[in-house]
Amino acid sequence: MEERGFMEVETPVLVSVAAGAMAKPFTTHHNSLDRDLYLRIATELYLKKLIVGGLEKVYEIGRIFRNEGLDFYHNPEFTMLESYEAFADYNDVMEMVEHAVSTLAMEVLGTTTIDLEGEQIDLTPPWPRLSLHEEVKIGSGIDFLECSDLESLRTEMKAAGLDTGEQVSWGGLLDKLISDTVEPKLTQPCFLVDYPVEMSPLAKRNRHDPRL
C-alpha cells in the first residue's frame, strides 16, 4: 500500500454509530460518559472523514466485530484491511485489489493457483467484473430494480420459493437474496459491481444509472 502512496492510520474501535456495513454490532457501555457505545463493524466512516479532511490515500488494518453467525466464512471478530482513495473509482480499486492478492499469493506460496476445499482457485488477474443486477436475475429470475419497495421484493422472492427471513429493509432483503442465490455459485475470484444505492449509501452514484 505504501508503494501506491497510501498512509496507514488507526481509527476508533469504540464508536457511537455502528455503520459502514450491514451487520449487527456488539454493544458496550461507557461508565464515565454513561452512554452505550458499539464495537465497530467497519472502519469506513472514519477513513472517509480523513479523505474529506484532505488525506488522499488512507488504509487501516484493524479488528472488526460483528455480532452475527459463526461458520466457515464468518467469525464475530476478524482482521480487515480497508482503504479509500480520492480521485479514483471502483475500477482503480478493483485493479489494486487483484494486484495485491495475486502478488501476495506469489510471494507467500510461489503460485497464483491455490487449492480450496478440493477446488483449484486461480488468482491471476484480471478477475471478471460481474453485474450484480444480471447475476441476481440469472440466479433467481428476479429483477430487483423493478421492485421499488420492501414488500414488492418480498413478494417476488416468495413467488420464487425463496426464504425472506425477518429482514425489515429493502437493502437487507436484497442482501439475503444475493447471499442465497448468487454468492454460492461464485467459486473463482471476481467482482460483483454496480450495487443499488440502498446498499451503498455512501458511495458515488453510477454515472450511467443513478439507481446504482
Residue ranges and their predicted role:
Residues E2-L212:
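Class II aminoacyl-tRNA synthetase catalytic cores and aaRS-like
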